[in-house]
């Protein structure tokens, strides 16, 4: 009697295992597909997250997302369990002020990972109790009443920028990239607010110690993993990966840790002066001590100030100036409003001088709307009981999200010209303006709204009048202006020439 050859048996077993694996995969894909089959979207996005990863890798995900919404409507399936939303009236439901609608694993990838594990931060924390513990003690520091006394720090940094522009460029007719200098300003402002000292970007006219490049590389590297967070756990955020490749975010935390350690040593030695006592790091340390919180809280708070606080303000500053220079009529209207505002504080207009100027407000709102710093959907997990938006039901566990880039261009809300710069859209009735402001998702919404939004507005309403009144900028080639989106939005190529205006020369 013949017996089956062992190799034949092995081959048969292998074929069975392959068939079982394929059957399991087919059942899984069908199950995933059917769960949200009532929601339209690209075919491959219904069964895999790989299209989302590809979109992010192109650096044009924001434009792809907008095109998909134009094709499929307000509700589009971006992944097997991820749905993108566009209608601004749904913002209060997706981002409520109450607890219960949690952030997705998207944010886990944005937390810097150290040899001791991931560092929780106000922005990236998904656990609502952890978030409340981090945000609660410092929330009052970011209220407008607490932010306004920091105006003196902004003025000092404006003064440094002005001296650099006057000394390097205004008299020489030399071309320079205004985008870079606005980023230098934004980072030095946050350095001054946080540590009572600038990083030195403005004085040196360069990326000091590669800080800006380090932060950008961290964000750019994390962006694709936001679409497939489980891969990030395998590839980056575990003990083995840390030993082999080094921990993600360590270089940024090293910068933060250096400043924090230096301040702690100065405090112990009694070397803190009255100015330093007013900066945010000193306040963070005082809050941590008074509330008996772990020391890493100070690091987490400071990390958020340095990264999100600086880069996001720089994006909006560049948007304001690029569009003012590209649309001279709006620049002239803004300058006329500033010159007609009455006696202005010298050498730079104060917050009180400009806080209620309608066209300045319109230009800043339009910049916040047109180019938000964050251009991927803010993801949330549908809670128990599901969620209904319009006539669409979303089962529990579905990930939903709204992209500021897409929502801020909602034509029924902002007009048919929502893709272009038009500050006049804000020079409307109080009711319509309020409706549109509520639809701008740039700072997020609900209980996770951006803590630093008042600081950003203070910076913008200080730097824009100061530069518009003092200088005439000539944009060399508007076509050289480029953008890229890796979660954070970045603009480059704002080559300009600058000269002082006659009124500035006369001290008016």
Swiss-Prot record:
It holds the Pfam family p450. GO terms for molecular function: heme binding; iron ion binding; monooxygenase activity; oxidoreductase activity, acting on paired donors, with incorporation or reduction of molecular oxygen. Cytochrome P450 monooxygenase; part of the gene cluster that mediates the biosynthesis of aspernidine A, a prenylated isoindolinone. The starting point of the biosynthesis of aspernidin A is the production of orsellinaldehyde by the non-reducing polyketide synthase pkfA. Hydroxylation, methylation of one of the phenol groups, and prenylation, presumably catalyzed by the prenyltransferase pkfE, would be needed to yield aspernidine D. Subsequently, the cytochrome P450 monooxygenase pkfB is responsible for hydroxylation of aspernidine D to yield aspernidine E. Glycans are attached at residues 57, 305. Its cofactor is heme. The lineage of its organism: Eukaryota, Fungi, Dikarya, Ascomycota, Pezizomycotina. The chain crosses the membrane at residues 9-29. InterPro entries: Cyt_P450, Cyt_P450_CS, Cyt_P450_E_grp-IV, Cyt_P450_sf, Cytochrome_P450_monoxygenase. GO terms for biological process: secondary metabolite biosynthetic process. The keyword Nucleus does not apply. The gene is pkfkB. The keyword Membrane applies. It is a single-pass membrane protein. Belongs to the cytochrome P450 family. Pathway: Secondary metabolite biosynthesis. It is found in: Membrane. This is Cytochrome P450 monooxygenase pkfB. Keywords: Glycoprotein, Heme, Iron, Membrane, Metal-binding, Monooxygenase, Oxidoreductase, Transmembrane, Transmembrane helix. Its main location: membrane. One of its GO terms (cellular component) is membrane. Disruption phenotype: Abolishes the production of aspernidine A, but accumulates the intermediate aspernidine D. Its EC number is 1.-.-.-. Heme binds at residue 450. It comes from the Eukaryota.
């Amino acid at each position: 009697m013949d017996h089956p050859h062992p190799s034949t048996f092995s081959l048969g077993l292998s074929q069975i295992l392959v068939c079982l694996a394929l059957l399991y995969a087919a059942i899984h894909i069908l199950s995933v597909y059917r769960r949200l089959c009532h929601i339209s979207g690209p075919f491959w996005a219904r069964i895999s997250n790989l299209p989302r990863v590809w979109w992010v890798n192109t650096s044009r995900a924001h434009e792809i997302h907008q095109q998909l919404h134009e094709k499929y409507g307000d509700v589009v399936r971006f992944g097997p369990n991820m749905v993108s939303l566009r209608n601004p009236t749904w913002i209060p439901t997706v981002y409520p002020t109450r607890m219960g609608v949690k952030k997705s694993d998207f944010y886990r990838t944005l937390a810097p990972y150290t040899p001791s594990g991931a560092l929780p931060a106000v922005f990236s924390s998904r656990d609502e109790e952890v978030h409340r513990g981090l945000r609660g003690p410092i929330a009052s520091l970011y209220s407008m009443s607490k932010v306004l006394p920091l105006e003196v720090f902004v003025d000092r940094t404006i003064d440094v920028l002005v001296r650099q522009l006057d000394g390097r460029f205004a008299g020489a007719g030399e071309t320079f990239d205004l985008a870079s200098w606005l980023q230098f300003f934004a980072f030095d402002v946050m350095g001054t607010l946080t540590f009572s000292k600038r990083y030195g970007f403005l004085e040196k006219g360069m990326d000091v110690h590669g800080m800006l490049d380090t932060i950008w590389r961290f964000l750019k590297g994390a962006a694709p993993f936001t679409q497939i967070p489980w891969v990030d756990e395998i590839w980056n955020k575990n003990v083995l990966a840390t030993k082999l490749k080094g921990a993600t975010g360590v270089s940024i935390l090293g910068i933060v840790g250096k400043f924090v350690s230096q301040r702690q040593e100065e405090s112990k030695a009694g070397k803190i002066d009255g100015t330093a006592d007013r900066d945010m790091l000193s306040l963070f340390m005082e809050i941590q001590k008074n509330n008996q919180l772990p020391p890493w809280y100070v690091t987490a708070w400071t990390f958020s100030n340095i990264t999100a606080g600086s880069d996001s303000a720089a994006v909006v500053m560049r948007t304001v100036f690029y569009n003012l220079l590209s649309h001279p009529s709006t620049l002239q209207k803004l300058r006329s409003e500033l010159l007609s505002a009455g006696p202005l504080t010298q050498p730079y207009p104060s917050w009180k001088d400009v806080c209620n100027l309608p066209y300045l407000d319109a230009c800043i709102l339009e910049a916040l709307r047109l180019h938000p710093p964050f251009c991927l959907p803010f993801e949330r997990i549908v809670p128990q009981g599901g969620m209904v938006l319009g006539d669409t039901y979303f089962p529990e566990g579905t990930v939903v999200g709204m992209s500021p880039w897409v929502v801020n261009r909602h034509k029924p809300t902002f007009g048919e010209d929502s893709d272009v710069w038009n500050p006049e859209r804000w020079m409307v009735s109080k009711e319509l303006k309020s409706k549109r402001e509520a639809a701008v998702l740039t700072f997020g919404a609900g209980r996770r709204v951006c803590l630093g939004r008042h600081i950003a507005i203070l910076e913008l309403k200080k730097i824009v009048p100061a530069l518009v009144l003092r200088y005439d900028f000539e944009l060399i080639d508007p076509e050289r202006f480029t953008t890229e989106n890796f979660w954070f939005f970045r603009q480059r190529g704002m080559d300009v020439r600058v000269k002082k205006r006659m009124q500035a020369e006369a001290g008016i």
